[in-house]
Amino acid sequence: MTVLNGMEPLAGDMTVVIAGITDSPVGYAGVDGDEQWATEIRRLTRLRGATVLAHNYQLPAIQDIADYVGDSLALSRIAAEVPEETIVFCGVHFMAETAKILSPNKTVLIPDQRAGCSLADSITPDELCAWKDEHPGAAVVSYVNTTAEVKALTDICCTSSNAVDVVESIDPSREVLFCPDQFLGAHVRRVTGRKNVYVWMGECHVHAGINGDELVDQARANPDAELFVHPECGCSTSALYLAGEGAFPPDRVKILSTGGMLTAARQTQYRKILVATEVGMLYQLRRAAPEIDFRAVNDRASCKYMKMITPGALLRCLVEGTDEVHVDSEIAAAGRRSVQRMIEIGLPGGGE
């Protein structure tokens, strides 16, 4: 096992570079993601026997240097499969926790442990326990965008692409408590038609901020475009309304996870696509299909927590071996069961 201890010697004049890193509440600054930085990151990664994973919403420089880029669940499964015993997870904290849950014997690092998630924080273990007490016997279905403690109290996890399948796998007569995303939960209720699905009123502040008016305006201004909408978006209902009212062709309105967006982008015949999700996703979409004009429905939809994983944070992480992610063994075992139950029903799909 590769153990990350202490300061690792730096190449060339990178000592000066790391000395210039400044800390602030919004992340580690002072380092440019240039070729010198990239060369040093690759060297340190090899030296430490590490694999760097980056979420689709990360800064372009972080995505470019990563060994793998994807959604949180796909990356966590990769973490469990790769031979390297040190995982550097460039994402928000619950994602690194999920990687640790699925790889309990590996060292998992996150470049900045302060990178939280408004959606994961929207339900606490105590709140979930109280909700379960109000609905004895109900099945708890939790989105993978939850903390380890919430996963441990969950019967079965789901992703944005398989949430409907997961809920439909549960006895129709049994109540379902769906948490924490209200918009994904509303999507599940709408598609399944189940009235006994109760939805927690949590949200991702970035996706919730992509509103229906913006989407309607963009759709009407670009009648020749296809529309990709993430189910966490507050505008997902507006997208379906546009299709239902005939204002936008139904076959051009797609409610998709980030992984689903990449697949659809590679297969579409349209040359313009409006995208309703965190703006970091456009970088991966443009790489996957450079001939398509991808446009953000809201170009201000940027997650400040995702962007805390800066070039300086990643360099610091590999030099100092920080910040390591720990999950209590009993919580990890219970959380792992809820994820495995999801995988066992098939179609695990994309994490977000």
Curated annotation (Swiss-Prot):
Keyword Oxidoreductase appears in the UniProt entry: no
Positions bound to iminosuccinate: 55, 72, 143-145, 160, 230-232, 258
Pathway annotation: Cofactor biosynthesis; NAD(+) biosynthesis; quinolinate from iminoaspartate: step 1/1
EC number: 2.5.1.72
Record field: catalytic activity: iminosuccinate + dihydroxyacetone phosphate = quinolinate + phosphate + 2 H2O + H(+)
MF annotations from Gene Ontology: 4 iron, 4 sulfur cluster binding; metal ion binding; quinolinate synthetase A activity
Cofactor binding note of this UniProt entry: Binds 1 [4Fe-4S] cluster per subunit.
GO biological process: 'de novo' NAD biosynthetic process from L-aspartate
Binding site for [4Fe-4S] cluster: 117, 204, 303
One Gene Ontology cellular component annotation held by this UniProt entry: cytosol
Assigned protein family: Belongs to the quinolinate synthase family. Type 2 subfamily.
PANTHER family assigned: QUINOLINATE SYNTHASE, CHLOROPLASTIC, QUINOLINATE SYNTHETASE A
HAMAP family in the record: NadA_type2 (MF_00568)
Protein name: Quinolinate synthase
Gene behind the chain: nadA
